[in-house]
């Protein structure tokens, strides 16, 4: 929320400096993000009037102007295209100082003397508009200091509001809080009802009362939209970061900023019959004010006439029914209350974000619509003329928000704030916020909440308000005390921090990505799986809960590659969300992605790129941390996001633990990845669950090693061969490793060669050759019988 300080002080004016006001607002939870002066630093500039102009004798783009300062007439040479007799403009006389320490002196331009300068808005740093002189109102007093006339000793204050404080998205809401903070009265503009000058109405029919419990409309005839918006209103809008468009739009925006009620003005001539507030028809088309055509969904509330949709309710109006300064003569003015849930997320789902949707999503006072209607009507009549008709209202009382009283206990206040608060002070602070308190017992109140404080429904909400007004910085510091009994952790169970350190030691960097992703990205990684969609997403490309950590990691990988980071190794730990709300599983996972060279750049390091076995080694390091690496098996498998020939399924005692492999070529193409990328993802609970190591004394006796060259079927997994060897190698086997795999010349195309090293060591004696040879023969017999694997000849 951005607003003019002077506008706020017109409502409530505590006798404090700007800096003190800003600091107090921030301490009260209305955090001030920025304070921007309304104009640059300048002096000596007054309201001037151009009395006459003539063409410069030696320059086509310059004009010689006679300018009145209210006391004298000066000759000024000006190049602005809109310099003409009769307009009033900022006039910098000789001796004036413009922003940037630019001093005005007598000058001669192409042989003609100039005694001053006529200024644009950009030259005074009022705005960035630099297409001509800043034209002032016709009744601007000539000779008055321009800072005084335009109230430029002002500042734009921007507040970063939390979503629950939608009531402060207006000058009225901010004034209520400032009044309570400083115990200063609010001077609210008097808004009398405008008497009807004619009886023309357009009937209003609401077929979705739960989404729109209140709708007000009024016909205003014979308006003149060619009249300009008053400069004072344009300036207040500008300082609130709202661009002036035309009088009708400016007035509805002004009322929204002032009171907090979004409004809309339709061109009455474009409305066929009456107004219908209904749900859209699936696929119904609407061209919006920004020129974008959207296909509406059936869950979208629209304002329509008897033939077509005119606007997305609470978001944006349609182009064909919008006001036009050249052809619009009659208006239909709308002021309505839409339930936040009916508007929430709709703007983002259509790729929009408007001031109206921003307010309706957070909540608007359900009792404000009529006051806003009368305020906007009066401003329209004052500025563009016209005659107002009667107000037509459609209301469903049963669907309007019902605010229940809240019970507040002194005991709970003390417990949460760490201090006792005087009952009189409690009542005074709450009453200052227009909350009505009634004693309902000893140390207890029943508090009635006004309609504009839709964020207050619980006792803790009231205590938060007390803390805000009392001052968080004034609360005593009381450290909580608790008797804690440390809970022992099983020795067999590891922890996530150690796994994270292990991956960092292996060259990874930790990434933290959003749990919600683009539904299109979800479909790429998990085709055919129904995503869990958010009801109110941050944006349309963050609408699905992730079923894997891979989408976020791959997007982070792309981000790094786009910034010339060729060697990327990222990991993340977090939840994945599988299923729908009824059977949703939130499963802790750990995942990683790698690409680029195997080793960092260095004179002794090669430039080999990473491959499948690099990521497998990283996964084995994680699994080995548990002390139970032998419990895990790797086997060829399939995953829609992984390469069909480079995918491993990881299991533990027959239970799926995770996957690793190269990214699928089609997926890589869809994501624009032109290099090998390898991924892994593991169920965290299975990785950290291990077993205690068993102590065995180091043997003093020599090891015995045998190497076997085996011929196995092409489709026989090496893990199956190793497992069978281990089962038949006896209890003194201390090491078993596969150190070579060969396919090619001298080997049948359907077969492969595996080189395996076996090491035995007895703890109390030396093993003899007969024992080892007997064991080897048992191994070879089992391999031939069960896996058709034989010794290579």
UniProtKB/Swiss-Prot annotation:
Keyword tags: Aminoacyl-tRNA synthetase, ATP-binding, Cytoplasm, Ligase, Magnesium, Metal-binding, Nucleotide-binding, Protein biosynthesis, RNA-binding, tRNA-binding
Cofactor binding note from Swiss-Prot or TrEMBL: Binds 2 magnesium ions per tetramer.
Protein source organism: Pseudomonas putida (strain ATCC 47054 / DSM 6125 / CFBP 8728 / NCIMB 11950 / KT2440)
Compartments where found: Cytoplasm
Reactions listed under catalytic activity: tRNA(Phe) + L-phenylalanine + ATP = L-phenylalanyl-tRNA(Phe) + AMP + diphosphate + H(+)
PROSITE patterns: B5, FDX_ACB, TRBD
Domain tRNA-binding per the UniProt entry, residue ranges: 39-147
Record protein name field: Phenylalanine--tRNA ligase beta subunit
């Amino acid at each position: 929320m951005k607003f003019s300080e002077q506008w706020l002080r017109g409502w409530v004016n505590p006798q404090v400096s700007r800096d003190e006001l800003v600091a107090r607002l921030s301490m009260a939870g209305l955090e001030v993000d920025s304070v921007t002066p309304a104009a640059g630093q300048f002096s000596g500039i007054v309201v001037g009037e151009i009395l006459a102009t003539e063409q410069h004798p030696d320059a086509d783009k310059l004009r010689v102007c006679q300018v009145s300062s209210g006391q004298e007439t000066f000759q000024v040479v000006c190049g602005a295209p809109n310099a003409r007799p009769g307009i009033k403009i900022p006039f910098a006389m000789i001796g004036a100082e413009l922003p940037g320490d630019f001093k005005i002196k007598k000058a001669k331009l192409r042989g003609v003397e100039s005694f001053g300068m006529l200024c644009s808005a950009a030259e005074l740093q009022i705005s960035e508009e630099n297409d001509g002189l800043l034209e002032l109102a016709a009744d601007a007093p000539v000779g008055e200091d321009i800072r005084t006339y335009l109230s430029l000793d002002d500042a734009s204050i921007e507040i970063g509001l939390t979503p629950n404080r939608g009531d402060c998205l207006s000058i009225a809401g901010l004034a209520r809080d400032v009044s309570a903070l400083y115990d200063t009265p609010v001077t609210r503009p008097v808004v009398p009802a405008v008497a009807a000058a004619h009886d023309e109405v357009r009937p209003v029919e609401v077929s979705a009362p739960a989404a729109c419990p209140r709708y007000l409309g009024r016909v205003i005839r014979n308006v003149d939209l060619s009249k300009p918006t008053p400069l004072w209103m344009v300036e207040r809008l500008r300082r609130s970061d709202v661009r002036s468009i035309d009088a009708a739009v400016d007035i509805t925006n002004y009322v929204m900023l002032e009171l907090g009620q979004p409004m809309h003005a339709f061109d009455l001539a474009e409305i066929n019959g009456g107004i219908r507030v209904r749900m859209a028809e699936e696929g119904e088309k609407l061209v919006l004010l920004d020129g974008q055509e959207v296909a509406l969904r059936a869950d979208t509330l629209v304002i329509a006439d008897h033939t077509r949709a005119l606007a997305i309710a609470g978001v944006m109006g349609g182009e064909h029914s919008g006001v036009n300064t050249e052809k619009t003569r009659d208006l239909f003015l709308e002021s309505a209350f839409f339930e936040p849930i009916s508007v929430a997320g709709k703007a983002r789902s259509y790729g929009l974000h408007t001031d109206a949707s921003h307010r309706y999503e957070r909540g608007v006072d359900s009792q404000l619509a009529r006051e806003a209607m009368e305020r906007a009507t009066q401003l329209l009549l004052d500025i563009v003329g016209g005659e107002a008709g009667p107000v037509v209202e459609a209301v469903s009382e049963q669907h309007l928000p019902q605010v229940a009283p809240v019970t507040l206990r002194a005991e709970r206040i003390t417990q949460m704030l760490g201090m006792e608060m005087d009952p009189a002070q409690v009542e005074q602070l709450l009453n200052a916020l227009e909350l009505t308190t009634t004693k309902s017992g000893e140390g207890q109140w029943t508090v009635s909440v006004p309609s504009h404080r839709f964020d207050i429904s619980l006792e803790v909400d009231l205590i938060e308000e007390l803390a805000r007004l009392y001052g968080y910085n004034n609360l005593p510091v009381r450290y909580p005390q608790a008797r804690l009994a440390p809970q022992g952790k099983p020795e067999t169970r590891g922890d996530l921090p150690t796994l994270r350190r292990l991956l960092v030691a292996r060259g990874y960097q930790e990434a933290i990505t959003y749990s919600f992703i683009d539904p299109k990205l979800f479909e790429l990684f998990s085709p055919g799986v129904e995503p869990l969609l958010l009801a109110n997403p941050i944006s349309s490309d963050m609408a699905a809960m992730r079923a894997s950590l891979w989408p976020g990691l791959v997007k982070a990988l792309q981000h790094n590659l786009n910034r010339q980071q060729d060697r990327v190794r990222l990991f993340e730990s977090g939840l994945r969300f599988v299923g729908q709300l009824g059977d949703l599983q939130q499963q802790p996972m750990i995942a990683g992605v790698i690409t680029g060279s195997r080793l960092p750049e260095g004179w002794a390091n090669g430039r080999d790129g990473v491959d499948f076995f690099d990521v497998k080694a990283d996964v084995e390091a994680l699994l080995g941390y548990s002390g139970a690496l032998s419990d895990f098996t790797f086997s060829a498998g399939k995953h829609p996001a992984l390469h069909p020939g480079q995918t491993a399924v990881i299991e533990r005692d027959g239970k799926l633990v995770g996957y690793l492999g190269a990214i699928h070529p089609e997926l890589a193409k869809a994501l624009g990845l032109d290099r090998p990328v390898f991924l892994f993802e593991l169920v965290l609970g299975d990785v950290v669950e291990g077993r205690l190591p068993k102590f065995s004394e180091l043997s003093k006796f020599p090891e015995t090693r045998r190497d076997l060259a085996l011929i196995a079927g092409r489709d026989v997994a090496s893990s199956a061969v190793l497992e069978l060897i281990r089962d038949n190698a006896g209890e003194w086997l201390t090491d078993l490793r596969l150190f070579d795999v060969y396919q090619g010349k001298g080997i049948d195309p359907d077969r492969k060669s595996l080189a395996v090293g076996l090491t035995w060591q007895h703890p109390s004696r030396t093993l003899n050759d007969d024992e080892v040879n007997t064991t080897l023969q048992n191994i070879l017999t089992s391999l031939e019988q069960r896996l058709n694997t034989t010794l290579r000849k």
